[in-house]
Amino acid sequence: MVASHRLLTLMVFALLTIPMISGLISDKCTEGCKSTIGCNTRCMMRGGGYCESAKIHGAVKIFCCCNNYSNSPISSPVIN
């Protein structure tokens, strides 16, 4: 039972870190989110943003992550 729990924990860890290693998370997230309002302002043209915490090398770091919505009303051209 303990071995299967450890295996499951390892699999979840791998699934969470693979996108970060490959650059999928780091492309839309930057380190140093001080407030959600500031992150939303920085990511306004991408559909807003949010603060996300992640544990990297044993330390918890907070990132500002942009939504990257391609159909955001702010970033989409107006069609009349």
From Swiss-Prot:
Belongs to the DEFL family. Keywords: Antimicrobial, Disulfide bond, Fungicide, Plant defense, Secreted, Signal. Transmembrane segments: none annotated. This is Defensin-like protein 85. Disulfide bonds join 29-66, 33-51, 39-64, 43-65. It comes from Arabidopsis thaliana (Mouse-ear cress). Residues 1-23 form the signal peptide. It is found in: Secreted. GO terms for cellular component: extracellular region. One of its GO terms (biological process) is killing of cells of another organism.
